[in-house]
Amino acid sequence: MTERVRVAITGGSGRMGRTLIEAAKQNGIILLGAAIERAGSTLMGVDAGELAGVGSMNVAITDSLDKAVNDFDVLIDFTSPEASVFHTDWCAKNGKAIVIGTTGFNHAQKEQISAYADQIPIVMAPNMAVGVNLMWKLLEVTAEVMGHYCDIEIIEGHHRYKKDAPSGTALKMGEVIAETLGRDLEKCAVYGREGMTGERDRETIGFATVRAGDIVGEHTALFADIGERLEITHKASSRMTFANGAMRAATWLVEQDAGLYDMQQVLGLKA
């Protein structure tokens, strides 16, 4: 690829938004074309680079995708489920690709976004860290070999401000394991335990959630049998790992046809 990829970033003033701006600044292929913030923000007109602490980038924070329509090729969206659906609708109407890192979607919202994939290329992934996507491949192999003979638990931890639980990454871990074992996660998932729960059902997949301090993201899948257990863990120490993954997704996405993709495809881990 010889031409730079122009991106717009929504939620530009948030923790993840600022990290995405910093990642764009550091990336030799990416060019920041626009940074979007909600209407009424006191940061309108502030230089996005200055806001992110990386120096001037000559891109002012704006509240309008319409005004920036000619300034970018790919929208990178880590906001909220409602906002992401709105932004995907806008991209479909304006012929823009979109990378979605938002989590917490309900089934109907996922279906809405999937429908737009007939018109535009979309990467939608609950976690864009390379290590996490490799972990999902490891979970497939582990579930095939051990899953039918083990108790399976998924434990995740995030900072105190995270809104959804379990995390999208944890749910994806459960989906990967359940699909490999031929189970329906909606029927076999157990979200927390309390009181006299009785003996554990081996067919279930348990989830436990921690929300504390400034934990960036920690996920563990535990496969426990009598006499041994295997733990597969990923720990993120910086949001930059997610931001760099989003930049990688954007550079890949501009060369794709309309469709719904995930980070496994971006990284070449599946067709």
From Swiss-Prot:
Its EC number is 1.17.1.8. It is an enzyme of class 1 (oxidoreductase). One of its GO terms (molecular function) is NAD binding. NADP(+) binds at residue 38. InterPro entries: DapB_C, DapB_N, DapB_N_CS, DHDPR_bac, NAD(P)-bd_dom_sf. NAD(+) binds at residues 11-16, 37, 101-103, 125-128. (S)-2,3,4,5-tetrahydrodipicolinate binds at residues 159, 168-169. Pfam families: DapB_C, DapB_N. The active site is at residues 158, 162. It comes from the Bacteria. Its main location: cytoplasm. One of its GO terms (cellular component) is cytosol. SUPFAM superfamilies: Glyceraldehyde-3-phosphate dehydrogenase-like, C-terminal domain, NAD(P)-binding Rossmann-fold domains. Disulfide bonds: none annotated. Belongs to the DapB family. This is 4-hydroxy-tetrahydrodipicolinate reductase. It comes from Shewanella halifaxensis (strain HAW-EB4).
